[in-house]
Amino acid sequence: MGEEERSIHNLSLPKKAIDFFESEWGIERLHPPQFEAMGPLFDQHNILLAIPTASGKSLVAYIAILNQLLNHNPGSRAVYIVPLKALASEKFEELKEIGQHLGLKIGLGIGDATSEAKNIDDSDILICTSEKLDSLMRSRSE
């Protein structure tokens, strides 16, 4: 697979998403493992991506989320689950930047505060810990 083939311009995402990744994050092409994941993702398959730390798993997840929200299920919502509050905050900042460029609302659920409720309810993409997701599901099923 050549570098040209791995260009982000070959992704089936709206131009504004491609432009964001290129101009704001300096991403011009995907790494080989990221590129290999794109076929199944854009064909609506679930994948398990096991690659080293800092090799681009989050970008693959962001592209998968954007593909669903912008291409296949406009008006739907996504949940990005992480194990730690610190990681949730980090991903929130990244996704908030994407959301500002693409008109998506990003929510963060990591605490017990009722002030989070509106943020959670209004978000297109919710980033939360597994514990918070469990709490949300239990409290809303009652």
Where are these regions (language model features)?
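Interdomain "pre-motor" coupling segment immediately N-terminal to P-loop NTPase/helicase cores
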Residues: M1-N10
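Pyridoxal 5′-phosphate
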Residues: P14
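Conserved P-loop/Walker A NTP-binding site and adjacent catalytic elements of P-loop NTPases
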Residues: I18-E142
